[in-house]
Design a protein with these regions (language model features):
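Donor nucleotide-activated moiety binding/catalytic core segment of transferases
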Residues: 82-86, 242-285
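A nucleotide-sugar donor-handling region in carbohydrate enzymes
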Residues: 2-13, 138-211, 235-238, 352
Length: 387
């Protein structure tokens, strides 16, 4: 599929094309900050456009976003880059609803509209707790929050109480990415037996993550133990730790059993992998809840973006369930890793049932989040139109 090319002038032309639409044509707008955004939007967009027959606008900062060439006639797509055109888009936005998975609205350069009462909806891009993985106040300026589970509701309500904030609309939504993965599992699982020894390594972003701490040693141990290895660093790691990435490339890219993934893990590889090794990456919960399978957690310090997270009394979900959905391994005992991986299938049924139970208590509307979210958006539009 050939994707369009854009110059700076064409980015502004795209913005003008969006702004030329009638308000009714841009009643529902989605904004994608990066390639991962569509993982969290897809099922909701499909429900709105294909099931409810509603028109939406899809505005993206991703130059090669496949949605720019979507054949769906209910979607109008626009590329606005990530510079001054994007800043103006937010400042002068006229739309009924804007759906985003980007936190920190109105905290830095991404502002609420100064000219129109847009209703802002936030979709989480992780199941982790609000007060531990986001900056303080990251979602304060949204009108509605699509909550993954009861932990988000409890955390947001306590945050509002502690800081005297205006109550937000909280929708018992779920996690669209998990729904997509569970649906994909029916088609992909056990379709490629050549990948049965594939190990996914998914470090989080920031100082002291597993890649920085022990990544090279870990990859070396796994490859020497005849495992296939896919390393998928956080996308910001390629920018901020370029020297480390170069070292890894030079050392391992000649090995046919090693893959360095720069984007989203391809579904076929994700669903045919043997296990995941992570530290504090949100994808670890996605993996555990999709396959009802233990994750191996390397015990490195957790990055806390919110230095005042202890103002909220609730233990973060990623800490409280960590030892129940996975095995925690010290970076000083990596030699145990191959045997630990081979032993993961022991007590398989018991672990499966335990993780299923945790999933049911942690995530709302498993398999149905898009229906819940689309109904809320439809009702909101109907309310706006009746006023």
């Amino acid at each position: 599929m050939k994707l369009p090319s854009f110059s700076i002038g064409l980015v502004w032309k795209e913005l003008r094309r969006f702004e030329s639409l009638d308000l009714i044509e841009r009643s529902i707008v989605f904004y994608a900050e990066n390639k991962a955004s569509m993982n969290h939007f897809k099922s909701l967009i499909d429900e709105l456009t294909e099931k409810m027959n509603l028109d939406i606008c899809y505005v993206t900062s991703v130059i090669d976003d496949p949605m720019l060439t979507s054949k769906n006639q209910k979607i109008k797509s626009f590329y606005i880059g990530d510079s001054s055109a994007r800043t103006k888009f937010f400042l002068t936005l006229k739309a009924r609803i804007l759906v985003m998975d980007m936190p920190d609205l109105d905290k830095f350069h991404i502002k609420r509209s100064k000219i129109y009462p847009v209703h802002y909806i936030y979709i989480f891009h992780s199941m982790f707790s609000v007060h531990s993985y986001l900056r303080q106040g990251a979602i304060d300026n949204y009108d509605t929050i699509f909550c993954v589970g009861p932990h988000h509701v409890n955390e947001i309500r306590e945050t509002e109480k502690v800081y005297g904030l205006k109550p937000k609309n909280l929708v018992l939504y779920g996690y669209g990415r998990l729904d997509t993965l569970l649906e994909q599992k029916k088609n992909f699982q056990q379709t490629n037996f050549d990948l049965k020894d594939l190990i996914l390594i998914t470090p989080s972003y920031g100082e002291n993550n597993l890649l920085e701490t022990c990544g090279i040693k870990m990859i070396d141990i796994l490859l020497k133990s005849n495992f296939k290895v896919m390393l998928r660093p956080h996308f910001k790691t390629f920018r901020d730790s370029a020297k480390l990435i170069d070292i890894i490339k030079k050392r391992f890219e000649g090995n046919t059993d090693f893959i360095l993934e720069k984007g989203v893990i391809p579904p076929n590889l994700f669903h045919n992998s043997q296990c995941m090794i992570s530290d504090w990456s949100g994808i670890s919960l996605e993996y555990a809840f999709t396959f009802e399978r233990s994750v191996i957690f390397i015990d490195v310090p957790k990055k806390i973006l919110n230095p005042n997270s202890n103002d909220i009394s609730l233990e973060p979900i990623e800490i409280s369930i960590r030892d129940k959905i996975g095995h925690i391994l010290s970076p000083n005992t990596l030699e145990k890793l191959p045997d630990l991986i081979r032993d993961l299938d022991k007590n398989d049924q018991k672990i499966n049932e335990q993780i299923k139970e945790i999933r049911s208590k942690t995530v709302y509307n498993v398999g149905e989040s898009a229906v819940v979210g689309a109904k809320y958006i439809q009702q909101l539009i109907e309310k706006f139109n009746s006023n």
